[in-house]
């Protein structure tokens, strides 16, 4: 399964776009649609096309984590929501999350969805 355009649009909506690098509320240098990493530097500027490429690349690690660690079948909406979630918190936090444990142990999806609320924006 792959993230859909609807899933990409969800991330874009939550993240917003910034074409000049900035310090996010968590204190991390960020650009585009929430892209972070050693390739982001002070006063960096990118185009919307570059921001889109970075977002697509960044969602790959989220999708790899889901593929590697989720052991239950997901529908497209669930998958897209998980990609957005893992994109935001990172694969390591996802692998250690209660959300993943509940999901893999077959918990009711409403209970699993309730776990999203435990993760709030930094700052």
Regions found by a protein language model. Name each.
Residues 1-28, 35-64, 69, 92-123:
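Long, amphipathic alpha-helical surface segments
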Residues 11, 78-86, 115-117:
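Short alpha-helical scaffolding segments that buttress acidic/His motifs in well-ordered protein cores
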Residues 68-79:
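Short, structured surface segments that line ligand/substrate-binding pockets
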Residues 33-35, 85-87:
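Active-site-proximal beta-strand/loop segments in catalytic clefts of secreted hydrolases
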